[in-house]
């Protein structure tokens, strides 16, 4: 298996060298052709996907996991639309981000270049095969994909379509490769391939991400989990705060930018929490609170220490009453995952302090945590949300799949 993975790495390195020179018009054409081929291969994709669905049901996987595997007509349409949207994004490769002139007349700047070869290890959702490959191609990279065993047939079918599309548009098919085995040893071999892979990106549950982070020999862009907070200040507009909290928790509770802990200033807790709790209960949210919360909210379960660290991904919410913003920030610093935090307040100074002192990938004032998303922030498609501070912090779009090199323009300058 080691030799097979090494061969893939070498082919990816050659493909990456070619992709770095490809212009935007050519990349756009390839991505649009991928979309057409996805649309034209619906029957073949559905047939492969049915094999995965039947196997998942036979294994007794939970209905939610089976649903994540499903590639119906709507998902395939979204997949094709996603490819077209990525094709239309601005190409960052070759962009000169800054330029300055030295006293000797030497002009120095920074130019965006592809990362090179990207490895992506992911679970369940077969649409990641297409989404990840599209972003890597747009940024001029090659990618090696290793999907979850549950989606093996779907991933293989989709990867074959992408590779054929590359060939049909004159690009190297090895710019997209899929590890063709469900053997877990292949994952370890991939993580040891630092001579061929420039960066590894895991997408999935916390266990997978920790495994990759602990075993990879190359840099890893990751996010462990989203323990997201909303702090309702005593100078908040209560109606606005209720709308924001409902959206942050209830709209899509199973995603990483959903609120998991609500922090409420003691000065507003008595009048804010009862109607807020009633609205949450009407939406089916289970509430777990601190002692002060339980004195205000009837029938609220006792929160324990583990609740403050929890990423529920469900209709469960931890609530804590705090004395002031300083205590709220201390709580976020101790228990948060540096993903997304929001403050609801009408006080400019407190909002500014919250923005400065809370060190998460997105910090919001008077808006829902659900906005930590590439499209919602105007960045376009994303490969995930990084909670690593090195290289990328927050949504990882096309630009985050590039790096910069220095360039210098002279007219004969010599160093004295």
Swiss-Prot record:
Q: Which GO terms describe its molecular function?
A: glutamate-5-semialdehyde dehydrogenase activity; NADP binding
Q: What reaction does this enzyme carry out catalytically?
A: L-glutamate 5-semialdehyde + phosphate + NADP(+) = L-glutamyl 5-phosphate + NADPH + H(+)
One GO cellular component term of this record is: cytoplasm
The pathway it acts in is:
Amino-acid biosynthesis; L-proline biosynthesis; L-glutamate 5-semialdehyde from L-glutamate: step 2/2
Q: Which Gene Ontology BP annotations are present?
A: L-proline biosynthetic process
Identify the Pfam families for this entry.
Aldedh
| Primary location class | cytoplasm
> What EC numbers are recorded for this enzyme?
1.2.1.41
Q: Which UniProt keywords apply?
A: Amino-acid biosynthesis, Cytoplasm, NADP, Oxidoreductase, Proline biosynthesis
The compartments listed are:
Cytoplasm
Matching PROSITE patterns: PROA (PS01223)
- TM region positions: none
HAMAP family to which the protein is assigned, alphabetical:
ProA
Q: Which PANTHER family match?
A: DELTA-1-PYRROLINE-5-CARBOXYLATE SYNTHASE, GLUTAMATE SEMIALDEHYDE DEHYDROGENASE
The free-text function statement in the UniProt record for this protein reads: Catalyzes the NADPH-dependent reduction of L-glutamate 5-phosphate into L-glutamate 5-semialdehyde and phosphate. The product spontaneously undergoes cyclization to form 1-pyrroline-5-carboxylate.
Please state which protein family the record places this protein in: Belongs to the gamma-glutamyl phosphate reductase family.
Which protein are we looking at?
Gamma-glutamyl phosphate reductase
Q: Which organism is it from?
A: Syntrophobacter fumaroxidans (strain DSM 10017 / MPOB)
